[in-house]
Amino acid sequence: GFYTPETYPSMNLVWSDEFNDSELNTDLWNYDLADGCAVGLCGWGNNELEYYRQDTTNIKLKNGKLVITATLDGGTYYSGRINTKNNFTITFGRIDIRARLPKGQGIWPALWLLGSNIDQNPWPACGEIDLMEMRGQEPDRVQGTVHYSNGGYVTNTGFYVLDQSDFTEQYHVFSLVWDQNKISWYVDNENYKNFSNSGIAGWPFNNP
């Protein structure tokens, strides 16, 4: 498979986490906790059934990997979710994430970017870039998506489908290349979607 280099032409590495510590580096990451109701977003805006917690049953580091596991305990689904809010922002560049994905009905692995001004400029006006999402019942297909506001909610999605395989079988590299004019999505360095700024009035993607 594709292994990401530390640098690309005209780019320098500015942030990385190889998960080689014994526990998650909270200078880089925050834990999302509970069901979202405390922040007025029950179900985290997606009708999610699980309860996020900071527990090694659900989220831990092992052998240089971040391992997130969904569990069912006493009738409650638990899982883990982390973010970099107030710890790191980026405007333009390339993001690579190497991951092996789970499958199963109701499973929804995802890697998202949200506008850092979301507290002042609520979603979707702040903009959202979904670097990768996969529906657990379709483990051979991932998607890249943007969400934004242009006189109303707008979304645009592209798909990448594996041939005679699925994303649970081995690690793949999911990438986003982003500049002021275009956003591009890749799987194992193969480009499968581009989204261009064609004078969109509500284009929020020139901000961190």
Feature map (PLM): residue ranges:
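GH16 jelly-roll
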Residues: 1-208
